[in-house]
UniProtKB/Swiss-Prot annotation:
Single GO term (MF): UDP-N-acetylmuramate-L-alanine ligase activity
Species this chain originates from: Alkalilimnicola ehrlichii (strain ATCC BAA-1101 / DSM 17681 / MLHE-1)
E.C. designation(s): 6.3.2.8
Residues noted as binding ATP in the record, renumbered to the chain: 126-132
Stated name of the protein: UDP-N-acetylmuramate--L-alanine ligase
Localisation: Cytoplasm
GO cellular component, one term: cytoplasm
Keywords (A to Z) from UniProt: ATP-binding, Cell cycle, Cell division, Cell shape, Cell wall biogenesis/degradation, Cytoplasm, Ligase, Nucleotide-binding, Peptidoglycan synthesis
Chief location: cytoplasm
UniProt family annotation: Belongs to the MurCDEF family.
Amino acid sequence: MTDGDTSPAHTRPDAFGRVRHLHFVGIGGAGMGGIAEVLHNLGFTVTGSDLRENAITRRLAGLGVQVVFGHEADHVQGADAVVVSSAVQADNPEVQAAREYRIPVVRRAEMLAELMRFRYGIAVAGTHGKTTTTSLVASVLAEGGLDPTYVIGGRLNSSASHARLGSGRYLVAEADESDASFLHLKPMMAVVTNIDADHLETYGGDFDQLRHTFDEFLHHLPFYGLAVLCHDDPVLRDLGPEIARQVRSYGFAEDADLRAVDIEQSGRRTRFTVVDGEATFPVEVNLPGRHNVQNALAAIAVARELHVDVAAIQRALQRFQGIGRRFQDHGTLRFGDARVTLVDDYGHHPREIAATLRAVRDGWPGRRVLVVFQPHRYSRTRDLFEDFARVLSEADALLVTEVYAAGEPPVAGATGRGLCAAIRARGQVNPVFVETLEELQQVLPGVARDGDLVLTLGAGSIGGAAAELARRHGVEDGG
């Protein structure tokens, strides 16, 4: 494929005309903080505000970005543009002040699209796996000497960051379908991992509308662009022939362009053989589960298209250090005489939970799996209630907390307690309802048994609770 001049030198402060000072409202969000860091490193004046301090705001402050807490109208003074995420409401005082002062208000995805306009953009979309896949793509391209810029929705453990400004011509970015904002992006290459029923509130509850939006996203590719699609996903398999662009498929299916065979998992490491036409080569990825084999295949497909050599691909996948809250190993915990392994994962959709549970069963056969699940959003709990009840029934022991609302009003019946009742009625496992995460700290030690693998799951505050459990009860190896 060919493209125009995408030299990083073109993304200078003068590339945005008169705009030199960018103010981020909600700068502590994963997607926002990453873009802010890249723009700061490009030489723009970046400021931001958020409700409270977190790891992202601390990192940005350490880089020299001015971050304030609370939202006040005078925070936007001096800004040439104000960047907001979809979580920021129109009545936010900083947004209102920006409009009053005629300061442009730009959505996060629009700003990402502007960064992508000056580089060879590689956008990774999909309902599940996009953060891991984006991270793998960035890691493989970096190992191949391409030094990409990346903006990721999770924190790469290798760099302790969501973003990095590289000297190369490639920008690897996670593309968010949850609010349809990925339609702002116009990449040269697009990866789609899967299309599943989630965030349907954005699409009027209509899955066909969600599917159509992914179709539209793929047609934002230039006529010489490339769509990299998972051939194992039935929706993408059907959608592929409709895409009037070059398509490269990957997966386990025999008719995929790039596929994995001879898959073996041991603990968190997975080995397989890549078949790419007449070429075959072995790979070991430092991630567990067949779903992560698919994510690795997507990264390999991108790397092969950009002529990264096989040895670099193999090194990057073998050395991959993972992402925060994606099967994050917190090590051994001790509750009295019981010693358990604690793993924390962002999985919050039935399909993600099923994939993670399968990875645990395959990598740690014979271990009792104690799941601690925090449902995320009342709307998702309502829409996928029976699917949640079915997949969570596969745990050997189960604790369920109240729903993490994420700003949503309660929905009758779509509660943690209601989910426990539905799971109990299935008769496979007897769940324990835990009202709060503070209560979890007291209840879990009494439920855990020696040798358990404790798996905390959810997209809300459960990750912080897992870290607190590790802080209170963690032991050194051999301790």
